[in-house]
Amino acid sequence: MTGAQVKLPPLMTVADFLEWPGDGTKARYELVDGVLRAMAPPNDTHGLIQSNLAIAIGLHLRENRPGCRINITPGVQPRLRADWNFRIPDLGVTCAPNAPGILTMPDPVLLIEVLSPGNANDTWDNVPHYASLPSVVEILIVHSTRMKAELLRRNANGEWPENPEVVDAAGVIHLASIGLDLPLAEVYVQSHLARV
């Protein structure tokens, strides 16, 4: 038996999207150029990597940068076609004051995506949109099928590198935006990749 096809709105602005009550399912969406894009639920490895990052970064921030905080799946409104885009990374760090009731993360400095086979195109499509936010210093892409991370960091002139810095299984992720050196192996603790 198949379920009824859910009819989605044709085009939405960010204001429409933030007021939209949803489609009546538990599906999650982000807004891409005015069109709703469904977000697949994370698999176990994706979720574990996301949790490990949130714990490691959250503890570091609490101890070393008490004015900063990490959020899981924060909404960000890129500068590129700002009225038509509301992207949702896996994790984000901001050092702006807490703004209760605000659905957009204020002034993120670090945005993180966990790359899965099913979301690779969407993830890399989001990168230039994240980079359009003036507050963003670093964008971290962490793979969920192998122990690998790719880090993009804005330079002192405000420019982004053409290619990311690649961190392999034995490497350390240097997150200058929050002053954290995180061994990549810690990101994969308790995952099947840590045992490979």
What are these regions (language model features)?
Residues 1-196:
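Gly/Pro/Ser/Thr-rich low-complexity, intrinsically disordered segments predominantly at protein N-termini
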